[in-house]
């Protein structure tokens, strides 16, 4: 069976088509859905339009390529936006697809499984556009997971080249990392 997943991030939308455990096709469009969310709790109308159009295009492409199922997931930009429901409605109207908004913890777990597979112990730091997820697994069990609402795009929009402001922005979240395991390998994920 062929299936597709559409990953709606704060900076880009990704499409991956697979069958029988093998990736057949991957592509990405930069839509900057989370543009401006460092200063406003609302998604910009232009960003909603760009991103909904990309999702509709990818849904059509997946179906044209023979995908029997198309799954779509959204992350921090939609999760934290006061008008996230407007975006979800727009996507549904244009593509016919219901988008699932992932919790920060689920996003972190999926990043961990994607980087480490089902059995390896270790952790990931997944820097997205609007959030950063940190997740660890030890002896097959999830032992730590946190989602921090600061990602590369959001921090750049907020701080630009101001290192003092950058430090001030991230310091409140550093204590959340104190409980993370210290002796496991850690892998960086992003993009």
What is each residue range found by the language model?
Residues 1-2, 68-69, 120-122, 181-184:
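Short coil/turn segments at beta-strand junctions that form active-site/ligand-binding loops
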Residues 11-46, 138-165:
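Short glycine-rich, Thr/Ser-proximal phosphate-binding strand/loop in the N-terminal lobe
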Residues 1-24, 115-148, 191:
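Gly/Thr-rich phosphate-binding beta-strand-loop-beta motif of the actin/hexokinase/Hsp70
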Residues 157-190:
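ATP/pyrophosphate-binding catalytic subdomain of soluble kinases
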Residues 51-65, 173-180:
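A short, N-terminal amphipathic alpha-helix
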């Amino acid at each position: 069976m062929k299936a597709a997943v559409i990953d709606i991030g704060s900076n880009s939308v990704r499409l991956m088509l697979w069958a029988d455990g093998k990736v057949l096709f991957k592509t990405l469009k930069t839509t900057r859905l989370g543009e401006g969310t460092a200063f406003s709790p609302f998604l910009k109308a232009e960003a909603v339009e760009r991103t909904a159009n990309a999702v509709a295009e990818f849904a059509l492409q997946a179906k044209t390529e023979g995908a029997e199922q198309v799954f779509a997931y959204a992350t921090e930009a939609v999760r934290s936006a006061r008008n996230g429901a407007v975006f979800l409605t727009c996507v549904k109207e244009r593509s016919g697809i219901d988008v699932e908004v992932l919790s920060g913890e689920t996003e972190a777990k999926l990043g961990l499984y994607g980087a480490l597979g089902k059995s390896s112990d270790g952790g990931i730091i997944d820097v997205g556009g609007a959030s950063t997820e940190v997740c660890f697994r030890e002896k097959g069990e999830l032992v730590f997971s946190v989602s921090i609402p600061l990602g590369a795009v959001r921090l750049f929009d907020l701080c630009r080249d101001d290192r003092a402001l950058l430090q001030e922005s991230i310091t409140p979240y550093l204590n959340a990392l104190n409980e993370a395991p210290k002796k496991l390998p850690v892998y960086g994920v992003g993009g």
